[in-house]
Amino acid sequence: MRLLYLAPMFALVACGGDQLDDGYGYGAPDAGYSSDAGFVGCLSSNECAPGYYCNDFGRCEKQATGSGDGGMPTPPPEKEYEFAPPTSSQRFVYVAMTAQDELARIDGATLAVKSTKVGKSPKVVATIPGTDGAVVLDSFNGTATVVRPVGDTDSTRVLGTLQRLNRLDIDPTGRFAVIWFDLAKAIKEGNTFSVGSFQDVTVVRLAAGNEKAVNLTVGFRPREVQFDAAGNRAYVITQDGVSVIDLGYATDHTATIIPPIAVADPSISPDDLEVDVVSTGEWAAVRQTNSATLRVVNVGSSPGTAYSVTLASPATDIDLAPNGARLYAVQRAAKKLSVVDIPGDAQNPSGVETIDLTNATVGSLTLSLDGKRGLMFTNATSDERVTLIKLDQPGYPQSTWPIKKSVRAVAVSPSGDTALLINAKMAGDPATASTFDDFVDKSYGYTLLDLASGFGKLQITPVDPGAFTYAPDGTKVYVALDGGDAPTATRAIQVLTTQTGVVQTKTLGSPPSSVGILPGAAQAFVNQRHPLGRVSFVDLINDAQRTVTGFDLNSHIVN
């Protein structure tokens, strides 16, 4: 299962390292344990007791018996967390002021605030990559407003869209956007009274002075939108397959229906499929839960042409090389990693390389940004090890290192020399621990892992690590600690220097909700839950902290 760690762009954008709602573990109704205060769910199965797994609702549920080898329960599935790199404006933080029908723009260098009128009750905001502009959706009337800073003012362009859309994806080049309705997001936010189209999307051309919006029909119930690296095509992953939109053509011609390309047998539940489009946009890799067969389907020049690759056991995770030339398939049961060159090895599977991982940690794989390193771990069971595999070297050498706590999720630094491990927490209050190891297991925390030596620095935290982001050069990590809304709750940002491992804890005035980077202003920022609005900025060089409060009321806006 893939879970996306993205900043909550319905509130603030600039933006990076987003997260799921916090509060992990399990409670009495499911696992038979009394829950700790503030510890009422789970995000991975290694936070559950043996014999339980973390279900789709974040609760530990007893596994069925007799379904695995020797009548033992089948090991629970891996959960994949995708940590998106900061999709930041170069200099500004944007905040949707829903009640005022305005978008606030905060200058990370000067803390000056500018408000701009946009559509009705704006919530969804995204920045345009490589620029200081942003796009914001209204919640009622079906409009998107493109906002661009022009000196001390903002230029705006209002475009008509379909109504009640709640997702906004912008291609990596910043030239096009796809706006659509995500039912899963609406359910999560408790907003099912405002349901949008299950088959229509709005495509927006973002060229300054030549903006245009076009409505198109795609496959049933879009689940995700992906783009090729060139930003020429969007791939709408639906229940029926993949609808491929030529973005330039779509915005220059009369709107048409974009039927989906089937990527699996229609009898297979879409919930059992993971579909990833390679960066070239020519092929899609398809993993099916509990199936030892991978499919590689053409979604480019020969749509629908498909090939199958047989694995030693079902893939628990697949990852794509950044250049689109390789697929990596992790096989937990067989303790193997298959290296599939695309499309050659799919067309002739005899070329597939299989790496033996008998002595490694197997389950999930996270790649470095350059694709040269992979970090393997599992969050299905309590395994206190990680394995580094060098994917650019002959024989794929690997190293397995012990760590102090099992792992929930992994993010590799932009520089590729460290990784941040978000550690799993076992049930129970650390204050009741009987041994030091028991105390560590029952505590929240994260680990900075040096990928050259395997040395890990464990940082125990008073609350679950929340949103986080690396500095662009990988020299620092910013981790938010959100203990809730109680006046005495923990509310802080931790600054971790990767060269020394030293952590500074900076107290915040309000609970943090998201963390990101403004590269043009050399600032990290922390958005906070505050009735008037609050954002703190931390200098990337000297760690100086500044805060702006009160931009969510007209009387406090600096115009």
Per-range role (PLM):
Residues 16-24, 50, 55-559:
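Predominantly soluble domains enriched in secretory-pathway, periplasmic, or organellar proteins
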